[in-house]
Regions:
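Short, polar/charged alpha-helical segment
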Residues: 28, 32-55, 224
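Extracytoplasmic ligand-binding site segments that recognize negatively charged/polar headgroups
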Residues: 32-39, 61-62, 77-210
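A ligand-binding cleft/hinge motif common to bilobed small-molecule-binding domains
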Residues: 88-92, 212-230
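Short beta-strand->loop
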Residues: 99-106, 119-123, 145, 213, ...
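Periplasmic-binding protein-like
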Residues: 127-128, 186-189, 195-196, 227-251, ...
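A bilobed periplasmic-binding-protein/Venus flytrap-type ligand-binding module shared by bacterial periplasmic
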Residues: 130-137, 172, 244-255, 274
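An extracytoplasmic/periplasmic, membrane-proximal ligand-sensing/linker region
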Residues: 181-183, 283-326
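Mature extracytoplasmic/periplasmic domains
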Residues: 241, 250-305
Length: 326
């Protein structure tokens, strides 16, 4: 009987170890990347890390964070890692002690302002928001101010900051900009601009001719143009807002080990070149530029104060919902 009990206990231990090993090989990722890009990212990560399986939940940043907040409230957060649009969302999570610091992460070659000084999140790329317009549009916009002119009446579409993290970051950044301010958004509303669910819907509307002008992230417009879509893109004269699509490990991660591997991959030369090949501007300059950005062309960025944006973004979302509807 003693031998049987010992054998049974050993069997249970072996099963427990096997279950632990299987669990350690599954990584849960929540991301706001477009579906095709999320698939490419995960497949490249898995190729570099054999044996690791990845479960993905993909949605707009705002929807994703709403889901995550509900999981926190229930005491059952699911993701191990996040790859979402903007640093402001990460700052809010960090403030609530939801992020796990990774001090050993290799940040060589990254701009100092692209990652958290305490190394809880790390920018993976630079995504700017500018103006897209259909090739057949009557006007050729050059500035944000153009979009509130009578010639653009009822012709502009933009992503809702209630869904898109990049749009939310731009909204509060513009509100803080003395040259534009919140008046820019009231001007858009008065000029008949409509807000749609996300950047993908903006691209569809502009490329399809439903609306001639759109507020849109750079890579979507320029990649579509490269594929033959009748769309043009301009970096407005006043400058553009930019998000860094940061990656982070949750403090509640069930699989932090593979979470660190995921961060390592995103920041690696291979991960950065993958971002470039998908049409993004990588966080590491050494990874090169996407085809749509020639050498020597510099992008003017709007001044950004992440902490100031973080402090006002929820109030700005409420103001936007009141102005444009939820």
């Amino acid at each position: 009987m003693k031998n049987f009990v010992t054998t049974l206990a050993a069997g249970h231990l072996a099963l427990a170890l096997l279950a632990g090993a299987a669990h350690a090989g599954t990584l849960t990722l929540y991301t706001s990347q477009p579906e095709a890009d999320a698939t490419k990212t995960v497949e490249a990560f898995k190729a570099a890390n054999p044996g690791v399986e990845v479960e993905i939940f993909r949605s707009g940043t705002s929807d994703l964070l709403t889901k995550l907040a509900a999981e926190f409230a229930a005491g059952a957060p699911q993701p191990d890692v996040l790859l979402i649009a903007d640093a402001v969302s990460m700052e809010l999570l960090k403030k609530d002690n939801r992020l796990l610091a990774y001090p050993e992460a290799d940040v060589e070659g990254l701009a100092p302002d692209s990652y958290d000084a305490e190394r809880t999140y790390f920018g993976s790329k630079l995504i700017t928001t500018g103006i897209a317009y259909n090739s057949a549009a009557a006007e050729k916009p050059e500035s944000w101010a153009d979009l509130v002119k009578p010639a653009y009446k009822d012709g502009v579409v933009m992503p809702s900051p209630l869904y898109s993290g990049a749009a939310a970051y731009m909204m509060s950044g513009v509100a803080l900009d003395p040259a534009l301010g919140w008046e820019f958004y009231t001007g858009l509303k008065d000029n008949g601009t409509i807000a749609v669910r996300g950047n993908g819907a903006v691209l569809k509307a502009v490329a399809g001719g439903e609306k001639p002008y759109g507020v849109l992230v750079d890579f979507m417009a320029l990649n579509a143009k490269a594929q033959g879509s009748p769309i043009e893109f301009v970096f407005p004269a006043e400058g553009v807002s930019a998000v860094t699509e940061p990656v982070a490990i949750l403090s509640s991660a069930k699989n932090p080990e593979d979470g660190r591997r995921f961060v390592d991959f995103i920041l690696s030369d291979a991960g950065q070149k993958l971002a470039r090949d998908m049409g993004y501007l990588p966080a590491k300059a050494s990874a090169g530029r996407p085809d749509w950005l020639p050498e020597g062309v510099e992008i003017k960025l709007m001044p950004a104060d992440i902490k100031a944006v973080t402090e006002r973004i929820e109030a700005d979302k409420a103001g936007f919902a009141e102005l444009f509807g939820g």
